[in-house]
Amino acid sequence: MSLFDRLFILSQHLTPQHALSRAIGKLADSRTPFIKNTFIKWFIKRYNVNMQEALLPSAEDYTCFNDFFTRALKDGARPIHPDVSRLVTPVDGAVSQAGSIDYGKIFQAKGHSFSLVELLGGDLQRAQPFIGGEFATIYLSPKDYHRIHMPIDGELREMIFVPGKLYSVNPLTTENVPALFARNERVVCIFDTPLGPMSMTLVGAMIVASVETIWAGRVAPMSKTVRSYTYKPGEVTIKRGEEMGRFCLGSTVVMTFPKGAMRWREGLKAETPVRLGEDLGKILQTVATVDEQKTD
């Protein structure tokens, strides 16, 4: 690791992460035309953002930087895989890791794993269905589309806000900060789906102003304790491919599935680029199938 990389990692330990993120968040919400237009145009050029696929292609079309960052795409820009026996990729990004959850641990990077229980807020009962199951972690780079969609039909059961640090989640930090995704502030969403329970964890990061969901808006309790919100059956139902949330300044999504419920598509591994709507994996069994097997 270079000296610059070491200094970058060290600076994150020393930086007042939440104060910096709040300050950047206020700037990103500024509606002053000169500020927001300058910021947006610089960002487009700096990260080579493809505005040809954006529904609104000009910086002047957006009310603030966050409005631009969570921009909508043109119809048809991300077709959803037509085979409903396949899970679809929920975001644009790159796979950080994907594989099995072994002994309650999720692989982060060489030499680093983290606890499934801690990721999901410290509740063993909540994590139990996913032990021995499958996980995938997808990193969204600054230039990516930052809305998050459903990989399968789901009915929201619980949302958990977990306070924590706000380290960067770029590949360099992921490789060098232990248990990163179980240390950063995050929003955990537990869904009931045709293949059983599914968790989608939206991980906050340095200068991520906030995380939003379609049912709760901005999730920013400013709490130092874990907070859980439960939902009645049918209260929040989201179809495969529909939006479920978004990052106001990007981050990472961690998904978990039960053992034997699905299989990742062939070739899905670290650093694989992915796009919303693409084939992510095959559904191997549904809750209905399991129930039928029990009654036979």
Swiss-Prot record:
Would you name any one GO CC term?
plasma membrane
Q: Which Pfam families match?
A: PS_Dcarbxylase (PF02666)
Q: Does the keyword Lipoprotein apply?
A: no
Q: Which GO terms describe its biological process?
A: phosphatidylethanolamine biosynthetic process
Q: Kindly tell me the pathway this chain contributes to.
A: Phospholipid metabolism; phosphatidylethanolamine biosynthesis; phosphatidylethanolamine from CDP-diacylglycerol: step 2/2
- What exactly does this protein do? Catalyzes the formation of phosphatidylethanolamine (PtdEtn) from phosphatidylserine (PtdSer).
Its protein name is: Phosphatidylserine decarboxylase proenzyme
Query: Which source organism does the UniProt entry give?
Result: Hahella chejuensis (strain KCTC 2396)
What does UniProt list as this organism's lineage?
Answer: Bacteria, Pseudomonadati, Pseudomonadota, Gammaproteobacteria, Oceanospirillales
